[in-house]
Protein backbone atom coordinates (compact mmCIF):
# COMPACT_ATOMS: atom_id res chain seq x y z
CA UNK A 1 0.00 0.00 0.00
CA UNK A 2 1.63 3.19 -1.15
CA UNK A 3 1.21 6.13 1.18
CA UNK A 4 2.35 8.70 -1.38
CA UNK A 5 -0.76 9.01 -3.54
CA UNK A 6 -3.37 9.37 -0.83
CA UNK A 7 -3.72 11.83 2.01
CA UNK A 8 -3.58 10.40 5.51
CA UNK A 9 -6.16 11.34 8.13
CA UNK A 10 -5.06 12.51 11.56
CA UNK A 11 -7.47 12.07 14.46
CA UNK A 12 -6.54 13.26 17.93
CA UNK A 13 -9.16 11.70 20.17
CA UNK A 14 -9.08 13.73 23.33
CA UNK A 15 -11.21 13.06 26.41
CA UNK A 16 -12.91 16.40 25.84
CA UNK A 17 -12.53 17.35 22.18
CA UNK A 18 -11.89 15.35 19.04
CA UNK A 19 -9.54 17.06 16.58
CA UNK A 20 -9.51 15.66 13.05
CA UNK A 21 -8.18 16.59 9.65
CA UNK A 22 -5.76 15.81 6.86
CA UNK A 23 -2.02 15.19 7.17
CA UNK A 24 -0.05 18.12 5.79
CA UNK A 25 -2.65 20.71 6.85
CA UNK A 26 -1.56 23.25 9.45
CA UNK A 27 -4.72 22.99 11.56
CA UNK A 28 -7.47 20.41 12.11
CA UNK A 29 -10.54 20.74 9.83
CA UNK A 30 -12.91 19.48 12.47
CA UNK A 31 -12.87 20.16 16.19
CA UNK A 32 -15.90 18.98 18.13
CA UNK A 33 -16.70 17.78 21.65
CA UNK A 34 -16.15 14.03 22.26
CA UNK A 35 -19.73 13.66 23.43
CA UNK A 36 -22.52 11.27 22.66
CA UNK A 37 -25.95 12.47 23.80
CA UNK A 38 -29.11 10.42 24.21
CA UNK A 39 -32.61 11.88 24.67
CA UNK A 40 -33.88 11.96 28.25
CA UNK A 41 -37.50 11.98 27.10
CA UNK A 42 -39.46 10.01 24.55
CA UNK A 43 -40.33 11.79 21.33
CA UNK A 44 -43.99 12.64 20.86
CA UNK A 45 -43.87 14.45 17.54
CA UNK A 46 -43.81 12.07 14.63
CA UNK A 47 -41.73 12.92 11.58
CA UNK A 48 -39.30 15.15 13.48
CA UNK A 49 -36.47 12.86 12.43
CA UNK A 50 -35.49 12.29 16.04
CA UNK A 51 -32.41 10.16 16.47
CA UNK A 52 -31.56 7.81 19.30
CA UNK A 53 -28.17 9.46 19.68
CA UNK A 54 -26.39 12.68 18.79
CA UNK A 55 -22.65 13.29 18.49
CA UNK A 56 -20.43 16.32 18.98
CA UNK A 57 -21.74 19.83 18.33
CA UNK A 58 -25.25 18.59 17.62
CA UNK A 59 -25.34 16.90 21.03
CA UNK A 60 -23.97 20.09 22.56
CA UNK A 61 -26.66 22.28 20.96
CA UNK A 62 -29.50 19.96 22.04
CA UNK A 63 -27.98 19.36 25.48
CA UNK A 64 -31.07 20.65 27.30
CA UNK A 65 -32.99 17.47 26.41
CA UNK A 66 -30.09 15.02 26.31
CA UNK A 67 -27.97 13.08 28.75
CA UNK A 68 -24.40 13.69 27.66
CA UNK A 69 -21.72 11.03 28.02
CA UNK A 70 -18.03 11.25 27.28
CA UNK A 71 -16.79 7.86 25.98
CA UNK A 72 -13.19 8.74 26.84
CA UNK A 73 -12.34 9.19 30.51
CA UNK A 74 -8.81 10.01 31.66
CA UNK A 75 -7.58 9.34 28.13
CA UNK A 76 -8.93 5.78 28.16
CA UNK A 77 -11.92 4.70 26.09
CA UNK A 78 -14.56 3.41 28.49
CA UNK A 79 -17.40 2.95 26.01
CA UNK A 80 -16.44 1.44 22.65
CA UNK A 81 -19.91 1.65 21.10
CA UNK A 82 -20.00 5.39 21.67
CA UNK A 83 -16.38 5.69 20.52
CA UNK A 84 -17.34 4.02 17.25
CA UNK A 85 -20.13 6.58 16.86
CA UNK A 86 -17.60 9.38 17.32
CA UNK A 87 -15.25 7.93 14.71
CA UNK A 88 -18.14 7.33 12.33
CA UNK A 89 -19.22 10.94 12.79
CA UNK A 90 -15.61 12.09 12.20
CA UNK A 91 -15.22 10.23 8.91
CA UNK A 92 -18.65 10.63 7.38
CA UNK A 93 -20.05 13.90 8.74
CA UNK A 94 -17.05 16.06 9.62
CA UNK A 95 -14.31 15.11 7.15
CA UNK A 96 -16.67 13.54 4.58
CA UNK A 97 -14.20 10.85 3.58
CA UNK A 98 -14.34 7.11 3.05
CA UNK A 99 -12.11 5.61 5.76
CA UNK A 100 -11.29 2.60 3.54
CA UNK A 101 -9.40 4.98 1.23
CA UNK A 102 -7.08 6.70 3.73
CA UNK A 103 -4.43 5.66 6.23
CA UNK A 104 -5.43 6.88 9.71
CA UNK A 105 -3.12 8.20 12.42
CA UNK A 106 -4.68 8.04 15.91
CA UNK A 107 -3.27 9.38 19.16
CA UNK A 108 -3.30 8.13 22.73
CA UNK A 109 -2.07 9.04 26.19
CA UNK A 110 1.14 7.42 27.41
CA UNK A 111 0.87 4.60 29.96
CA UNK A 112 -2.54 3.65 28.61
CA UNK A 113 -3.68 0.03 29.03
CA UNK A 114 -2.43 -2.12 26.14
CA UNK A 115 -5.92 -3.41 25.48
CA UNK A 116 -7.01 0.14 24.65
CA UNK A 117 -4.76 0.50 21.60
CA UNK A 118 -5.44 -3.09 20.49
CA UNK A 119 -9.15 -2.38 20.41
CA UNK A 120 -8.55 0.90 18.54
CA UNK A 121 -6.54 -1.02 15.96
CA UNK A 122 -9.20 -3.69 15.66
CA UNK A 123 -12.04 -1.20 15.13
CA UNK A 124 -10.09 0.75 12.50
CA UNK A 125 -9.33 -2.36 10.44
CA UNK A 126 -12.49 -4.38 11.01
CA UNK A 127 -15.24 -1.79 11.31
CA UNK A 128 -13.89 0.98 9.11
CA UNK A 129 -11.65 -1.12 6.82
CA UNK A 130 -8.82 1.41 6.81
CA UNK A 131 -5.91 0.44 4.51
CA UNK A 132 -3.35 1.37 7.18
CA UNK A 133 -3.17 2.94 10.63
CA UNK A 134 -0.81 4.01 13.39
CA UNK A 135 -1.16 4.99 17.04
CA UNK A 136 1.14 7.78 18.25
CA UNK A 137 1.80 9.07 21.76
CA UNK A 138 0.25 12.52 22.22
CA UNK A 139 3.12 14.28 23.98
CA UNK A 140 5.67 13.13 21.39
CA UNK A 141 3.54 14.76 18.69
CA UNK A 142 3.43 18.03 20.65
CA UNK A 143 7.21 18.10 20.68
CA UNK A 144 7.29 17.56 16.90
CA UNK A 145 4.94 20.49 16.53
CA UNK A 146 7.24 22.75 18.55
CA UNK A 147 10.10 21.90 16.19
CA UNK A 148 12.23 20.20 18.84
CA UNK A 149 13.69 16.74 19.27
CA UNK A 150 14.64 17.18 22.94
CA UNK A 151 12.48 18.51 25.75
CA UNK A 152 9.97 17.59 28.39
CA UNK A 153 6.34 17.90 27.39
CA UNK A 154 3.78 18.75 30.04
CA UNK A 155 0.58 17.78 28.26
CA UNK A 156 -2.70 18.45 30.00
CA UNK A 157 -6.02 17.92 28.32
CA UNK A 158 -9.53 17.31 29.56
CA UNK A 159 -9.01 13.83 30.95
CA UNK A 160 -5.37 13.27 31.75
CA UNK A 161 -2.09 15.13 32.22
CA UNK A 162 1.33 13.68 31.71
CA UNK A 163 4.96 14.66 31.57
CA UNK A 164 7.04 13.00 28.90
CA UNK A 165 10.79 13.61 28.67
CA UNK A 166 12.13 13.14 25.15
CA UNK A 167 15.80 13.12 24.22
CA UNK A 168 16.93 13.28 20.58
CA UNK A 169 13.51 12.04 19.50
CA UNK A 170 13.34 9.12 21.96
CA UNK A 171 10.74 9.15 24.70
CA UNK A 172 12.21 7.95 27.99
CA UNK A 173 9.47 5.56 29.18
CA UNK A 174 10.86 5.03 32.69
CA UNK A 175 10.55 8.77 33.37
CA UNK A 176 7.06 9.32 31.98
CA UNK A 177 4.66 10.35 34.73
CA UNK A 178 0.93 10.45 34.48
CA UNK A 179 -1.45 12.54 36.53
CA UNK A 180 -5.17 11.82 36.38
CA UNK A 181 -6.01 15.45 37.03
CA UNK A 182 -7.00 17.60 34.11
CA UNK A 183 -9.62 19.91 32.63
CA UNK A 184 -12.65 17.83 33.54
CA UNK A 185 -11.61 17.71 37.19
CA UNK A 186 -11.17 21.49 37.14
CA UNK A 187 -14.66 21.87 35.66
CA UNK A 188 -16.08 19.67 38.44
CA UNK A 189 -14.17 21.68 41.01
CA UNK A 190 -15.50 24.92 39.52
CA UNK A 191 -19.04 23.49 39.82
CA UNK A 192 -18.36 22.79 43.47
CA UNK A 193 -16.96 26.22 44.37
CA UNK A 194 -19.71 28.00 42.45
CA UNK A 195 -22.20 26.01 44.53
CA UNK A 196 -20.57 27.48 47.65
CA UNK A 197 -21.34 30.90 46.19
CA UNK A 198 -24.98 29.90 45.90
CA UNK A 199 -25.17 29.01 42.22
CA UNK A 200 -26.28 25.45 41.59
CA UNK A 201 -24.98 23.51 38.60
CA UNK A 202 -25.76 19.80 38.61
CA UNK A 203 -26.86 18.31 35.28
CA UNK A 204 -24.57 17.19 32.47
CA UNK A 205 -25.81 20.14 30.42
CA UNK A 206 -25.02 22.64 33.19
CA UNK A 207 -21.54 21.19 33.49
CA UNK A 208 -20.94 22.40 29.92
CA UNK A 209 -21.90 25.93 30.99
CA UNK A 210 -19.39 25.75 33.85
CA UNK A 211 -16.72 24.51 31.42
CA UNK A 212 -17.37 27.62 29.35
CA UNK A 213 -17.09 29.87 32.44
CA UNK A 214 -13.78 28.18 33.27
CA UNK A 215 -12.41 28.58 29.74
CA UNK A 216 -13.42 32.22 29.46
CA UNK A 217 -12.66 33.59 32.92
CA UNK A 218 -10.21 31.42 34.86
CA UNK A 219 -6.50 32.21 35.15
CA UNK A 220 -3.49 31.04 37.16
CA UNK A 221 -2.23 33.34 39.92
CA UNK A 222 1.52 33.89 40.19
CA UNK A 223 1.23 34.03 43.96
CA UNK A 224 -1.91 32.31 45.21
CA UNK A 225 -1.96 33.70 48.77
CA UNK A 226 -1.37 37.29 47.63
CA UNK A 227 -4.10 36.92 45.00
CA UNK A 228 -6.54 35.64 47.65
CA UNK A 229 -5.88 38.75 49.72
CA UNK A 230 -6.36 41.03 46.72
CA UNK A 231 -9.65 39.30 45.95
CA UNK A 232 -10.81 39.67 49.56
CA UNK A 233 -10.00 43.36 49.81
CA UNK A 234 -11.29 44.64 46.47
CA UNK A 235 -13.67 43.72 43.69
CA UNK A 236 -11.07 44.36 40.98
CA UNK A 237 -10.86 40.67 40.11
CA UNK A 238 -14.60 40.13 39.83
CA UNK A 239 -16.10 39.31 36.47
CA UNK A 240 -19.66 38.65 35.43
CA UNK A 241 -20.95 35.90 33.18
CA UNK A 242 -24.34 35.70 31.49
CA UNK A 243 -26.04 32.32 31.64
CA UNK A 244 -28.09 31.08 28.65
CA UNK A 245 -31.32 32.19 30.37
CA UNK A 246 -30.11 35.76 30.81
CA UNK A 247 -29.28 35.48 34.51
CA UNK A 248 -25.93 37.11 35.31
CA UNK A 249 -23.57 35.56 37.83
CA UNK A 250 -20.49 37.16 39.38
CA UNK A 251 -17.31 35.25 39.99
CA UNK A 252 -14.31 36.44 41.96
CA UNK A 253 -11.59 34.32 43.55
CA UNK A 254 -13.07 31.22 41.85
CA UNK A 255 -11.34 32.48 38.72
CA UNK A 256 -7.91 31.51 40.04
CA UNK A 257 -8.92 29.06 42.78
CA UNK A 258 -10.12 26.65 40.12
CA UNK A 259 -6.87 26.19 38.11
CA UNK A 260 -4.79 26.44 41.31
CA UNK A 261 -5.73 22.77 41.77
CA UNK A 262 -3.23 21.96 39.01
CA UNK A 263 -0.47 23.12 41.36
CA UNK A 264 -2.20 22.02 44.57
CA UNK A 265 -4.16 18.81 43.89
CA UNK A 266 -5.04 18.68 47.60
CA UNK A 267 -7.79 21.21 46.67
CA UNK A 268 -9.50 18.26 44.97
CA UNK A 269 -8.72 15.88 47.80
CA UNK A 270 -5.97 14.26 45.73
CA UNK A 271 -2.68 13.21 47.24
CA UNK A 272 -0.68 13.54 44.04
CA UNK A 273 2.00 16.10 43.23
CA UNK A 274 1.04 19.21 41.25
CA UNK A 275 2.00 19.67 37.59
CA UNK A 276 5.17 21.58 38.52
CA UNK A 277 6.34 18.87 40.89
CA UNK A 278 5.38 16.11 38.47
CA UNK A 279 7.49 17.82 35.79
CA UNK A 280 10.39 18.09 38.24
CA UNK A 281 10.05 14.44 39.32
CA UNK A 282 9.98 13.38 35.70
CA UNK A 283 13.21 15.30 34.98
CA UNK A 284 14.85 13.79 38.07
CA UNK A 285 14.13 10.28 36.78
CA UNK A 286 16.28 11.06 33.74
CA UNK A 287 20.02 10.74 33.40
CA UNK A 288 21.88 13.59 35.09
CA UNK A 289 23.58 14.53 31.80
CA UNK A 290 20.37 15.39 29.97
CA UNK A 291 18.51 17.27 32.71
CA UNK A 292 19.88 20.62 31.63
CA UNK A 293 18.40 20.14 28.14
CA UNK A 294 15.05 19.20 29.64
CA UNK A 295 14.91 22.19 32.02
CA UNK A 296 15.66 24.44 29.06
CA UNK A 297 12.85 22.97 26.95
CA UNK A 298 9.68 22.55 28.99
CA UNK A 299 6.92 22.47 26.39
CA UNK A 300 3.31 23.01 27.47
CA UNK A 301 0.59 21.38 25.39
CA UNK A 302 -3.13 20.66 25.60
CA UNK A 303 -6.21 22.74 26.35
CA UNK A 304 -5.72 22.81 30.12
CA UNK A 305 -2.43 24.68 29.64
CA UNK A 306 -4.34 27.55 27.99
CA UNK A 307 -5.00 29.40 31.27
CA UNK A 308 -3.42 32.87 31.27
CA UNK A 309 -0.49 33.01 33.69
CA UNK A 310 0.28 29.29 33.65
CA UNK A 311 3.71 29.60 31.99
CA UNK A 312 4.97 32.26 34.42
CA UNK A 313 3.74 30.26 37.39
CA UNK A 314 5.31 27.09 36.03
CA UNK A 315 8.60 28.94 35.61
CA UNK A 316 8.44 30.25 39.17
CA UNK A 317 7.61 26.84 40.68
CA UNK A 318 10.23 24.94 38.67
CA UNK A 319 12.89 27.53 39.49
CA UNK A 320 12.16 26.97 43.17
CA UNK A 321 12.63 23.20 42.80
CA UNK A 322 15.60 23.12 40.42
CA UNK A 323 19.28 23.78 41.23
CA UNK A 324 19.82 27.54 41.59
CA UNK A 325 22.11 27.91 38.56
CA UNK A 326 19.80 26.04 36.21
CA UNK A 327 18.38 27.94 33.25
CA UNK A 328 14.71 27.18 32.91
CA UNK A 329 12.63 27.89 29.85
CA UNK A 330 8.92 27.25 29.51
CA UNK A 331 7.67 27.09 25.94
CA UNK A 332 3.96 27.79 25.58
CA UNK A 333 3.14 27.98 21.85
CA UNK A 334 -0.07 29.92 21.12
CA UNK A 335 -1.49 26.97 19.16
CA UNK A 336 -0.81 24.49 21.99
CA UNK A 337 -4.48 23.55 22.18
CA UNK A 338 -3.95 21.73 18.90
CA UNK A 339 -0.24 20.95 19.04
CA UNK A 340 -0.85 17.20 19.36
CA UNK A 341 -2.87 17.27 16.15
CA UNK A 342 -0.36 19.52 14.38
CA UNK A 343 2.45 17.13 15.36
CA UNK A 344 0.40 14.24 13.97
CA UNK A 345 -0.08 16.14 10.74
CA UNK A 346 3.68 16.70 10.48
CA UNK A 347 4.53 13.08 11.33
CA UNK A 348 2.04 11.48 8.93
CA UNK A 349 3.31 13.56 6.03
CA UNK A 350 7.02 12.75 6.51
CA UNK A 351 8.37 10.51 3.74
CA UNK A 352 10.39 8.56 6.31
CA UNK A 353 7.20 7.74 8.22
CA UNK A 354 5.53 5.95 5.32
CA UNK A 355 7.12 2.58 6.17
CA UNK A 356 5.89 2.88 9.77
CA UNK A 357 2.18 2.42 9.01
CA UNK A 358 0.55 -0.84 10.08
CA UNK A 359 -0.99 -2.15 6.88
CA UNK A 360 -4.19 -4.19 6.57
CA UNK A 361 -2.07 -7.17 5.42
CA UNK A 362 0.10 -7.03 8.54
CA UNK A 363 -3.00 -6.77 10.70
CA UNK A 364 -4.67 -9.75 9.01
CA UNK A 365 -1.51 -11.75 9.57
CA UNK A 366 -0.78 -10.84 13.20
CA UNK A 367 -3.99 -9.51 14.73
CA UNK A 368 -4.42 -6.47 17.04
CA UNK A 369 -1.20 -7.12 19.00
CA UNK A 370 0.80 -5.87 15.98
CA UNK A 371 0.19 -2.36 17.37
CA UNK A 372 2.67 -2.92 20.22
CA UNK A 373 5.41 -4.00 17.83
CA UNK A 374 4.96 -1.22 15.31
CA UNK A 375 3.97 1.76 17.44
CA UNK A 376 6.61 3.12 19.85
UniProtKB/Swiss-Prot annotation:
GO molecular function: ATP binding; hydrolase activity; myosin binding; structural constituent of cytoskeleton
GO biological process, one term: phototaxis
Catalytic activity: ATP + H2O = ADP + phosphate + H(+)
Pfam families referenced in this protein's UniProt entry, alphabetically: Actin
GO cellular component term of the entry, any: phagolysosome
Gene3D superfamilies in the cross-refs: 3.30.420.40, Actin, Chain A, domain 4
Family recorded in the similarity comment: Belongs to the actin family.
Keywords: ATP-binding, Cytoplasm, Cytoskeleton, Hydrolase, Nucleotide-binding, Phosphoprotein
Organism: Dictyostelium discoideum (Social amoeba)
This protein's name: Major actin
Lineage summary: Eukaryota, Amoebozoa, Evosea, Eumycetozoa, Dictyostelia
EC identifiers of the protein: 3.6.4.-
Keyword ATP-binding recorded: yes
InterPro entries, sorted: Actin (IPR004000), Actin/actin-like_CS (IPR020902), Actin_CS (IPR004001), ATPase_NBD (IPR043129)
Residues the record lists as Phosphotyrosine modifications: 54
